[in-house]
Swiss-Prot record:
Glycosylation sites: N38
Residues exposed to the Lumenal side: 29-45, 105-119, 176-202
Protein name (database record): Lysosomal membrane ascorbate-dependent ferrireductase CYB561A3
Catalytic activity: Fe(3+)(out) + L-ascorbate(in) = monodehydro-L-ascorbate radical(in) + Fe(2+)(out) + H(+)
Membrane association type: Multi-pass membrane protein
UniProt KW keywords: Electron transport, Endosome, Glycoprotein, Heme, Iron, Lysosome, Membrane, Metal-binding, Oxidoreductase, Translocase, Transmembrane, Transmembrane helix, Transport
EC number(s) per entry: 7.2.1.3
Protein's UniProt keywords contain Transmembrane helix: yes
Domain spans labelled Cytochrome b561: 12-219
Annotated localization: Late endosome membrane; Lysosome membrane
């Protein structure tokens, strides 16, 4: 039986995820001038919002689908589809976030992919894309044998947690980079901790807290989905009745 601590953790996780997105929106709206889709700096402001929403919050939530007790009984297929759909939604938000930053850079003739933040971020997105397509092909389509799925499942689980960790690192480095670029004049330098810096740093801490809670729920052995019985060697997952 799953204890009330699990549901309390889920409630806390939902609150933290909502705060991560809302804090990022407020930062971009209040201190950075709001949003647009015209190649200006206001178009860039979509980038942090969409990356936090996609690569952290939606991705983290999608990773926990199989921790829900409701997914432990009855057909497994609906939960597989939900898991894949939430990750796909996270990926779409991420791609739109990348379009926003690349369009802004190209419009202002700023170099792309030169900073450590950008290298880390684009690597994370590449791994996410590989993870999603591999998971879809192996764990959802009916062609893969049980042997192949058993071989790849630990790798899939490892990269799921690794990608979330890399996403958090990308967000934190991105917040820092944005503050260094924006708060560099003599009236409000970053090192003097103006209100924007305090708020943005707090947003980063919320992202870290969200990520750590996701990892805690993922790693808690008592909250993992019980292993099903032995399946036939080539039972297609699109037709399973687990």
């Amino acid at each position: 039986m799953v204890s009330g601590r699990f549901y309390l953790s889920c409630l806390l996780l939902g609150s933290l995820g909502s705060m991560c997105i809302l804090f990022t929106i407020y930062w971009m709206q209040y201190w950075r001038g709001g949003f647009a889709w015209n190649g200006s700096i206001y178009m860039f402001n979509w980038h942090p919002v969409l990356m936090v929403a996609g690569m952290v919050v939606f991705y983290g939530g999608a990773s926990l689908v199989y921790r829900l007790p409701q997914s432990w009984v009855g057909p497994k297929l609906p939960w597989k589809l939900l898991h894949a759909a939430l990750h796909l939604m996270a990926f779409v938000l991420t791609v739109v976030g990348l379009v926003a930053v690349f369009t802004f850079h190209n419009h202002g003739r700023t170099a792309n992919l030169y900073s450590l933040h950008s290298w880390l971020g684009i690597t994370t997105v590449f791994l996410f894309a590989c993870q999603w397509f591999l998971g879809f092909a192996v764990f959802l389509l009916p062609w893969a044998s049980m042997w192949l799925r058993s071989l790849l499942k630990p790798i899939h689980v490892f990269f799921g947690a690794a990608i979330l960790s890399l996403s958090i690192a990308s967000v934190i480095s991105g917040i820092n980079e944005k503050l260094f670029f924006s708060l560099k004049n003599t009236t409000r330098p970053y090192h003097s901790l103006p209100s924007e810096a305090v708020f943005a740093n707090s947003t980063g801490m919320l992202v870290v807290a969200f990520g750590l809670l996701v990892l805690y729920i993922l790693l808690a052995s008592s909250w993992k989905r019980p292993e099903p019985g032995i399946l036939t060697d080539r039972q297609p997952l699109l037709h399973d009745g687990e």
